Amino acid sequence: MTIDKQMTAISKAEQERLLQEAEKVSERAYAPFSKFFVGCAILTSDRKTYVGCNVENSSYGLTNCAERTAIFTAIADKDDGRKLDIKAVAVVNRDGVPCAPCGACRQVIFEFGPNAIVIYKAADGSIAQTPITELLPVGFRLD
């Protein structure tokens, strides 16, 4: 697979829409232990949007992040036989704390969107967008 070094172009309006979707779903997060409520919205190459929130578990290793929840939902919804292709991932913390994906989520995003951009609110309130290849410069691939 070839990885395009150019970021996927996402309009400002689309970025804001994805962030709003992520913010809305962060309200549904189940985070009784960390109190870190995260929402995510992904945009696929076929222009569909999927959302997910983090779901914690008493056995911490079984916790699932918002990004992976959204990606796994998109995979479960696909019925065309093609591999999921992510264009953008927006991540929001319910309390406004800037948050970028954890390492595990970066790897999963890279698997399904090697040219994806990650969108999140920076500490100054501006919208940050970073290619996944900058967040995970040497992602693991078997193909």
Residue ranges and their predicted role:
Residues 2-31, 83-143:
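C-terminal binding/interaction regions
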Residues 35-44:
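Short beta-strand scaffold segments in enzyme catalytic cores
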Residues 37, 50, 59, 101:
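Short glycine/serine/threonine-biased micro-segments
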Residues 50-53, 128:
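Structural signal for short hydrophobic segments within the conserved structured cores
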Residues 54-69:
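Compact, glycine-rich, soluble single-domain proteins
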Residues 76-83:
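Phosphate/pyrophosphate-binding loops at sites that engage ATP/ADP/AMP, CoA/4′-phosphopantetheine
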